[in-house]
Amino acid sequence: MRKSPSIPTILNKNVSFIDSPGCWVFYTFLCLALRVILAGLGLSTSVAWVIVNWFHGIITFFLFHWIKGAPFASDHEHESELLTFWEQIDDQVLYTRARKFLFLFPIALFFIAVDSSGWDLAYFWINSVVLLITVLPKLPFMHRVRLFGINS
């Protein structure tokens, strides 16, 4: 696996898998699989993509930006106990391939969901809320920021 030169050589084992393109393919596959399942249930294309976008947004918000610490014992356990999963990725180095993928994926989902609904205003605003909830915590100025002391 080719690593970015900006990434430290000793990575937190709890998040090192995120840098793998295979992980990105699997991540994309999970969203597409959910879309296929929803289509199989008879939901319209627009509703199915909105649900995929919401599921993705809610799950990634809690997994990446709410839960702190390392789920498995590692050398970085004490260093990461106050960091969210997102903050632990690539040992806090910004603008790596993994972070770019995870930043752009919800934006792509937003455009797919909005476009499949024909740019309907109601769907646009519903998906915009999810986009903000998913992308805003990933921005560099939000690194280690806990709003209103929540989750500190």
Map each language-model feature to its residues.
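Residue-level micro-sites within transmembrane alpha helices that shape
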Residues: 52-55, 99, 105, 126, ...
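Alpha-helical transmembrane segments and their membrane-interface exit regions
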Residues: 55-63, 130-140
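Hydrophobic alpha-helical membrane-embedded segments
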Residues: 41-42, 46-71
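Membrane-lumen (extracellular) interface motif
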Residues: 18-21, 33-52, 112-128, 143-150
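Alpha-helical transmembrane spans of integral membrane proteins, capturing the lipid-embedded, hydrophobic core
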Residues: 20, 24, 28, 32, ...
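Multipass alpha-helical transmembrane domains of eukaryotic endomembrane proteins
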Residues: 2-12, 60-117, 142-152
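Cytosolic-side membrane-entry/anchor segment at the start of a transmembrane helix
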Residues: 1-27
